[in-house]
Amino acid sequence: MKVVIVGAGMGGMSAAIALRQIGIDTVVYERVTENKPVGAAISVWSNGVKCLNYLGLQEETAELGGKVETMSYVDGHTGDTMCRFSMHPLIEQVGQRPYPIARAELQLMLMKAYGIDDINFGMKMVGVENDTAGSAAKATFADGTTVSADVIIGADGAGSITREYVLGGPVSRRYAGYVNYNGLVSTDDAIGPATEWTTYVGDGKRVSVMPVSDDRFYFFFDVVEPQGSPYEEGRVREVLRAHFAGWTPGVQTLIDTLDPLATNRVEILDLDPFHTWVKGRVAVLGDAAHNTTPDIGQGGCSAMEDAIALQWAFKDHPDDVHAALAAYQSARTERAADLVLRARKRCDVTHAKDPQVTSRWYDELRNEDGTNIIRGIVGNIVGGPLTPVTAATEG
């Protein structure tokens, strides 16, 4: 059996490794010519880490991951700690430490595990279809190349061409209402403790820092802005100083420290969940299937879960492509949709879609001992192929 995977992002590479583990011939095509992911880092929660471990990357993942011992919320205006709590109850409940990881390093780890020389870079897919006999699927690339395979997996991102084919037309993404500015800086106690995930909140905005490897923080600023607001590259400090004027010194230090030319600006969008992921021998995976906001940190993790579910589906149905893809779709659509909607709900609370609701959340944070926050995070983590719901995780 030959499976073509279009897209060498986290989902595509995880799927390629997972299918190769069970002896399936995989070929990966990627439109870019070098490893330049959008976003500086990613929070890989325990369900995602378990997927990476399953793919044989336990040591590499732990080496790249930041060690988060505690989590805190801080009043952005006063600098007062609203709550601080240990992450160890979460680790004990789900059986795995989460790891924030620099995105380019995670991507490179996956590519190396699969074999960088086995990835076909610079190949932009412009069309995908099943053949008229239903015996193969075909992808067409911008250079005129066509490839046929028993299965084509479209891991071609949020603007997926594969999704258009599977659904029979384009689907509009929804602007979530905010812009995320993100990057990497050296750890600095003036910004936050080196082993803590620190989040400053206020006025429907947030600033967050978390440790990644090599004594660095991954940081992001969330700002409510109209979609398409003008922005001049390299002027991020001026923009953030205006948005966060009067905020606590830790935030000002972060703004002063960041590299304006290495800071990403991302308008955040998502997709309404849909439950048709397969058309004949063509299927979607990752952001192509469930583009989500980053508000619960599950987008990449969900893509990795897709990869494991895809492997299991082909394990169960090694000689029946259609049964395997149907099993994959059945295993994933409800779970992925739930994560999209959980993220959307958290997004609205965090970014003051209803200011009264957000104000109540700030009050709750001031009375939080970590129990409720950890319960919510565990609720996001469980439900995937390697993190089934158990009596322990339900508690």
From Swiss-Prot:
GO BP term, pick one: urate catabolic process
The entry's keywords: FAD, Flavoprotein, Monooxygenase, NAD, Oxidoreductase, Purine metabolism
Binding sites annotated in the UniProt record for substrate: N180, R206, Y218, F219, F220
Its EC number(s): 1.14.13.113
Binding, FAD: G11, E30, R31, S43, M125, D287, G297, Q298, G299, G300, C301
Segments forming a coiled coil: none
InterPro entries on file: FAD-bd, FAD-dep_Monooxygenase_BioMet, FAD/NAD-bd_sf, HpxO
Key word Nucleus present: no
Domain of life: Bacteria
Reaction(s) catalysed by this chain's protein: urate + NADH + O2 + H(+) = 5-hydroxyisourate + NAD(+) + H2O
Positions of the record's site feature: Involved in substrate activation for the transfer of oxygen from the flavin hydroperoxide: R206
UniProt enzyme class: oxidoreductase
Pathway the protein takes part in: Purine metabolism; urate degradation
Cofactors: FAD
Gene Ontology molecular function, alphabetical: FAD binding; FAD-dependent urate hydroxylase activity; NADH binding; NADPH binding; oxidoreductase activity, acting on paired donors, with incorporation or reduction of molecular oxygen, NAD(P)H as one donor, and incorporation of one atom of oxygen; urate oxidase activity
Function description: Catalyzes the hydroxylation of urate to 5-hydroxyisourate (HIU). Is likely to be involved in the urate degradation pathway to allantoin. Prefers NADH over NADPH as the electron donor.
Assembly with partners or alone: Monomer.
UniProt family annotation: Belongs to the FAD-dependent urate hydroxylase family.
Protein name per Swiss-Prot or TrEMBL: FAD-dependent urate hydroxylase
Gene label: hpxO
